[in-house]
Amino acid sequence: DFASWKIKKNKLKMQQNRNVKDIKLNRLDKKITITFDNNKIYHYPAEYLRVYSPSAEVRGHSNQPPKLIYGRKHIGIMNIELVGNYAIKISFDDMHDSGIYSWELLYDLGENFDKYWDMYLKRLKQENRSRNP
């Protein structure tokens, strides 16, 4: 099952004057692909997006450390919704749907994928947790 959204360039502004040109959800591969107006293309596995959800439930409140999300190796994405002209809301198949992913956040997650993924794997190991359910 493959869904693709062509986004109107003038509607999706983000900081640094970036626009999102295209968002594709591939449910079979469990990933989202986003093309920005500078032609950078980033592939976001569902697990990665779930782990780095910007929701308060995951990020914590004020001075709390982010909650470690584990056991989501096989998580899927049920739906993507546009939020205004600056973000998307992702509904995951574990029923988490409270994170609003701004274009700025998504660009950062794409640019720093290797670094952030490595940090996540190290934290899993430190806390004796697994990606497997």
Mark where each language-model region is:
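Motif-centric detector for short Cys/His coordination patterns
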Residues: F2-P133
